[in-house]
């Protein structure tokens, strides 16, 4: 996947647990885990907005374009 979700890094920097973030944002821990493991295929803007609000970050802090591995 060429988009990486830096949720782990932001949680560590903010000394926040995944369960605390889930409660604040109103998303299940299971869905946040999918994001954290880079297995999500999409994210709603409302979810991205809520994550950025609670983590006090910009979308670019949370999402990173890593490029394709198979580029020639």
What are these regions (language model features)?
Residues 6, 31-34, 47, 61:
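Residue-level recognition of specific faces of alpha-helices
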Residues 8, 19, 49:
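Residues within the helices of the helix-turn-helix
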Residues 1-16:
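A short, Lys/Arg-rich alpha-helix, primarily the initiator
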Residues 9, 34, 63-72:
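Short, charged recognition helix plus adjacent turn
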Residues 12, 23, 53:
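Alpha-helical residues within the helix-turn-helix
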Residues 16-34:
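Short alpha-helical DNA-recognition segment
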Residues 39-50:
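Short, basic-rich loop-to-helix N-cap that marks the start of a DNA-contacting helix
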